[in-house]
Amino acid sequence: MTQAILLCQSHELADSSLAVPFKVHYFGKNQAAFAVRYQGRVYAYLNRCSHVPMEMDFQPNQFFDLTGHSLMCATHGATYAPQTGQCRLGPCRGGLVKIEVSEAEGLVHWHTSDKFQLPL
């Protein structure tokens, strides 16, 4: 059974701006995750590059490149589509791991699943 877990208020996520960080329990470990807004919609992913499993932000909660149209790994420069997490350019092995989110009545929630649970 899935749960909707409050992440933030909608106004905390501006288009192509800072992310809101959160934690999830994924395959036996607490992992960093982040949510961003792009072209009016909210997306969330594990904070883990698909090239080398390390956190991607080069400054706290900063994932967008200078164009504001790609999420970028600060370590190797791999870029990802904000809408899908798919690799656009650089050393990638697949895409980012997506976390389901919803937005209603001024609130953003992330959703537990068989893969993602509340952190321990």
Where are the regions a protein language model picked out?
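N-terminal pre-ligand scaffold of iron-sulfur
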Residues: 1-66, 81-82, 95-120
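Short cysteine clusters
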Residues: 49, 73-76
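Active-site metal-binding motif and surrounding structural segment of the metallo-beta-lactamase
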Residues: 68-70
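Axial heme c-ligation environment in periplasmic c-type cytochrome domains
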Residues: 90-91
